[in-house]
Structure formats: structure tokens, C-alpha cells
């Protein structure tokens, strides 16, 4: 993983560091901002351990979870420096994270999982039921191995994959047409309540909860043309799903833990084309973040924040239809003129999940090269002279 954010923070990992163009300080310590670039890991020795998927194929009312579906590696280095680390370490060793909404290897959810893993956290994943088989198969066949590489050269280990559809809180909420849908055939225990019960049964508790879920069936429609059904579907899948996740996972979260979601600037700015109620859903998500920060903080000492990330050309974002235009606009008009990477959002999430952010809660953190701060479009002909001077 190429961490591109310039920082003196260090990510402490559970695995030995390897000689590379990255700045290696000490076995198990990596500096965020060091760029492995074209690092070669020719001497990487990997042992992949695969075991059966659990809690995905059982049809009983009470969740019964099989052995974890895991991917682990052992990285060996010729040498490592025994220098004392400097700066502030991001150390999540001994912490366990559940990331809801990962279905491939090129979105923000995946990048967050990688950064948390690089900091030493154990990774659990919740995957949308219709995408589950493809995701599992891709993992088993090593199709994601290249994007699983961590700063120390080892591969991110996904301890367990759970089936999840966060639109449904419990089995009683699932309508008959969904139960009989062939895309859900063979899977069980995938409502939010059941997923939380399975995680509790398998691991007991978690420390970090990540919500990387959004869906607007009418996102391409202007708000004036959006149906009530489409609007409420966007709210349900994109914002209330976070409330439901935290509600059901909070009882198994260790005090001092953190919950993180992903939002977008359309919550407070007009983004033509981002319709179907999605802008409303993001606004609701940010408002809920503040309320949940109070409630979860007072009840369980859990911090709740959301990251307002800039546009990324992920597979999911392609559904918006103009994501490439937004990426270009962001590049041309942001204070920092560069392309935003998923790793930068992942590193911000690792910070928010760490003790370094112990006093940050109820906040919307912008990771968008500063685009949110701009009041004008610099690529407009009106500002041609200003751009030439700069």
C-alpha cells in the first residue's frame, strides 16, 4: 500500500518490516507518508491458510458460525533496523475492526481495512449478500493479493467474512420476495442483528466499527423527479443503516472504541446529478453522527465520526455516472492540486480509530484535498487571470 499523505505518524504492525524504499524504523513500525512506490518484494515468503467460511450458509434461526475464512501470510526480511521509533505511533495491535460494505478491492472500505490492518488491527468484513460469492471467490483465488500488500510487504489478513444486508435490522424485517430471491439463496444470518450476534459468538467483542455503505436506486434522477420509495430507500441504505449497525454492535464494542462512516460534500453543497435523495441521506448521516457521538459516548465511551471523502473512481461510484468529471473538477479546483487516493482516506480512518484521536468525536473530517473550503471554481474562465498568476 502506498501511503501518500505526508505525515510523521507511524503505523505499528504485527509483522516484521522489510527492506524497501519505505522508511523502516523498527520491526513492526511504518511511517505514514513513506512511499514504497516500486518496491519489490521478491523475497517475500507467504503461507496462505484458508479455512471454511462461517456463519454464511447456516439456515437455523440461531446463528451457528463455522471456522473463519482467513488469509494470512508470513513475511521474512533479510534485515531490519533496530532504531527507536520517533514521532507518534498509530498502534492498533490487539484491536478488532468490523468493516461493513466491502465487496471489492478498489473502494474506500477496502483502503480503510488495509490501513487498520497495517496498524495492527484484526479485520472482519461484512459483504452485501448478492456480492458475497464473487468476493469470496476472488479472495480464494488470489485476485486481490496485489492490493492486499501492506507496507511491510505482508498481505492484509481478513480474519472472517460475514454476509450482511444492512437494510434489514432483523429476520422479521425481511420481506418474502427477498427471502426467495435467488441472489440470497444459500445465505443466512445476514441481517444486522444476526451479523452482530455472529461476531459476538465468534470473537466476543470489537473495538472499531466502520460503515462503508451507500445506495440510492434513483441516484441519477433530480430530486423533483425522485419517488418517495426511491428517496426512502436511499435514506435506509445510506444513513439509517449506520444507526442500525451502531445500535446492534454497540453492546459488543469495548469502551474507548471508535465508529466511523463515510459521507460526501453533497450533504451541504449542491452537486447536480447526485440525486435520488442521496444528498439528503448524507446530510442525515452527518447529523446522526453528532447525535450518536453523544449517545454512544455517554452510554459506552465510544467515539463516532464521519469522513467526508472526495470523489474516487471506484466501481460503486461509477453508478453515479459522472464520477470521472467530479474527479477532474476536484483536481482542477482544490487547494492541493493532486488526485485523491483511497489510501489517504484509509490513513485518516486509522488515525480516527486510534488513541491519538481520543478527544475527537461527533466530527465530520474532510479528506478531499481541501475542495470543501473552496467558494469558487478556479477552472472557470472568470478566474483565468488568477490561475495564470498562480
Swiss-Prot record:
Instruction: Identify one Gene Ontology CC term for this UniProt entry.
Output: thylakoid
The principal localisation class reads plastid
Say what the protein does: Catalyzes the NAD-dependent reduction of a carbon-carbon double bond in an enoyl moiety that is covalently linked to an acyl carrier protein (ACP). Catalyzes the last reduction step in the de novo synthesis cycle of fatty acids. Involved in the elongation cycle of fatty acids which are used in lipid metabolism. Required for normal plant growth.
The protein's matches in SUPFAM superfamilies, at most eight in alphabetical order, are given as:
NAD(P)-binding Rossmann-fold domains
State the encoding gene: MOD1
How might one describe the regulation of this protein's activity?
Inhibited by the phytotoxin cyperin and the synthetic antimicrobial compound triclosan.
Q: In which pathway does it act?
A: Lipid metabolism; fatty acid biosynthesis
Top-level taxon in the UniProt lineage: Eukaryota
Enzyme type, top EC level: oxidoreductase
Return the Gene3D superfamilies for the record: Enoyl acyl carrier protein reductase (1.10.8.400), NAD(P)-binding Rossmann-like Domain (3.40.50.720)
Cellular localisation: Plastid, Chloroplast
- CDD domains to which the protein is assigned, alphabetical: ENR_SDR
- So which tissues is this one expressed in? Expressed in flowers and siliques and at lower levels in roots and leaves (at protein level).
Transit peptide as recorded in UniProt: 1-74
Which reactions is this enzyme annotated as catalysing?
Answer: a 2,3-saturated acyl-[ACP] + NAD(+) = a (2E)-enoyl-[ACP] + NADH + H(+)
Subunit structure of this chain's protein: Homotetramer.
Q: What happens when the gene is disrupted?
A: Premature cell death in several organs, chlorotic and curly leaves, semidwarfism, distorted siliques, premature senescence of primary inflorescences, reduced fertility and decrease in total lipid content.
Q: Does the keyword Ribosomal protein apply?
A: no
Entry-linked InterPro entries? Enoyl-ACP_Rdtase_NADH (IPR014358), NAD(P)-bd_dom_sf (IPR036291), SDR_fam (IPR002347)
> Which species is this UniProt entry from?
Arabidopsis thaliana
What is this protein's name? Enoyl-[acyl-carrier-protein] reductase [NADH], chloroplastic
Q: Which GO terms describe its biological process?
A: fatty acid biosynthetic process
Binding of NADP(+), residues = 53, 170, 282, 314
List the keywords (alphabetical). Answer: Chloroplast, Fatty acid biosynthesis, Fatty acid metabolism, Lipid biosynthesis, Lipid metabolism, NADP, Oxidoreductase, Plastid, Transit peptide
Amino acid at each position: 500500500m502506498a501511503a501518500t499523505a505526508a505525515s510523521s505518524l507511524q503505523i505499528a504492525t504485527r509483522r516484521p518490516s522489510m527492506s524497501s524504499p519505505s522508511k523502516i524504523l523498527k520491526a513492526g513500525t511504518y511511517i505514514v507518508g513513506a512511499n514504497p512506490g516500486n518496491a519489490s518484494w521478491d523475497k517475500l515468503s507467504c503461507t496462505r491458510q484458508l479455512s471454511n467460511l462461517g456463519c454464511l450458509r447456516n439456515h437455523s434461526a440461531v446463528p451457528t458460525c463455522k471456522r473463519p475464512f482467513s488469509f494470512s501470510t508470513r513475511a521474512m526480511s533479510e534485515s531490519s533496523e533496530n532504531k527507536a521509533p520517533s514521532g507518534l505511533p498509530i498502534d492498533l495491535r490487539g484491536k478488532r475492526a468490523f468493516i461493513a460494505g466491502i465487496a471489492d478491492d478498489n473502494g474506500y472500505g477496502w483502503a480503510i481495512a488495509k490501513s487498520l490492518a497495517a496498524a495492527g488491527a484484526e479485520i472482519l468484513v461484512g459483504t452485501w449478500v448478492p456480492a458475497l460469492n464473487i468476493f469470496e471467490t476472488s479472495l480464494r483465488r488470489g485476485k486481490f493479493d496485489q492490493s492486499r500488500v501492506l507496507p511491510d510487504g505482508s498481505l492484509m489478513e481478513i480474519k472472517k467474512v460475514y454476509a450482511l444486508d444492512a437494510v434489514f435490522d432483523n429476520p422479521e424485517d425481511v420481506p418474502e420476495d427477498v427471502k426467495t430471491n435467488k441472489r440470497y439463496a444459500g445465505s443466512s444470518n445476514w441481517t444486522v442483528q444476526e451479523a452482530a450476534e455472529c461476531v459476538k459468538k465468534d470473537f466476543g467483542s470489537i473495538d472499531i466499527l466502520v460503515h462503508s455503505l451507500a445506495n440510492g436506486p434513483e441516484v441519477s434522477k433530480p430530486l423533483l423527479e425522485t419517488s418517495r420509495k426511491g428517496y426512502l430507500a436511499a435514506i435506509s441504505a445510506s444513513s439509517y443503516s449506520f444507526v442500525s449497525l451502531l445500535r446492534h454492535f454497540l453492546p459488543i464494542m469495548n469502551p474507548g472504541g471508535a465508529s466511523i462512516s463515510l459521507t460526501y460534500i453533497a450533504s451541504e453543497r449542491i452537486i447536480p446529478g447526485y440525486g435520488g435523495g442521496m444528498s439528503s441521506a448524507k446530510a442525515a448521516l452527518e447529523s446522526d453522527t453528532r447525535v450518536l457521538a453523544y449517545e454512544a459516548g455517554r452510554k459506552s465511551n465510544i467515539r463516532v465520526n464521519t469522513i467526508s471523502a472526495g470523489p474516487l473512481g471506484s466501481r460503486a461510484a461509477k453508478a453515479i455516472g459522472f464520477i470521472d468529471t467530479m474527479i477532474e473538477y476536484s483536481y482542477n479546483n482544490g487547494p492541493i492540486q493532486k488526485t485523491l487516493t483511497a489510501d489517504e482516506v484509509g490513513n485518516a480512518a486509522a488515525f480516527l480509530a486510534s488513541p491519538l484521536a481520543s478527544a475527537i468525536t461527533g466530527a465530520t473530517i474532510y479528506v478531499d484535498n481541501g475542495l470543501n473550503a473552496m467558494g469558487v471554481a478556479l477552472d472557470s474562465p472568470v478566474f483565468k487571470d488568477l490561475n495564470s498568476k498562480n
